[in-house]
């Protein structure tokens, strides 16, 4: 639970460019995880959930920032 608070505070301090960079890295990692799963090489399937949630958190932060700029 404490790690989640640290992650959220880290996301709020990063620039938009850093957020997009991290988002692209996580999307590539998710692609690689899916590829490994298809080949039967994936050992840690729980990593899927962590990567997907991290992507969602970054997208939420980007949406929050874009909405705050509009008003």
Curated annotation (Swiss-Prot):
Pfam families: Ribosomal_L29. One of its GO terms (cellular component) is cytosolic large ribosomal subunit. Keywords: Ribonucleoprotein, Ribosomal protein. It comes from the Bacteria. InterPro entries: Ribosomal_protein_uL29, Ribosomal_uL29, Ribosomal_uL29_sf. The keyword Ribonucleoprotein applies. CDD domains: Ribosomal_L29_HIP. The keyword Ribosomal protein applies. Gene3D superfamilies: 1.10.287.310. One of its GO terms (molecular function) is structural constituent of ribosome. One of its GO terms (biological process) is translation. Belongs to the universal ribosomal protein uL29 family. NCBIfam families: L29. PANTHER family: 60S RIBOSOMAL PROTEIN L35/50S RIBOSOMAL PROTEIN L29 (PTHR10916), LARGE RIBOSOMAL SUBUNIT PROTEIN UL29C (PTHR10916:SF0). This is Large ribosomal subunit protein uL29. The gene is rpmC.
């Amino acid at each position: 639970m404490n790690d989640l608070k640290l992650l959220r505070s880290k996301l709020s301090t990063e620039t938009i460019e850093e957020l997009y960079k991290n988002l692209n890295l996580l999307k590539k990692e998710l692609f690689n995880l899916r590829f490994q799963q298809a080949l039967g090489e994936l050992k840690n399937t729980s990593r899927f959930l962590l990567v997907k949630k991290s992507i969602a958190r970054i997208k939420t932060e980007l949406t929050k920032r874009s909405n705050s700029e509009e008003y």
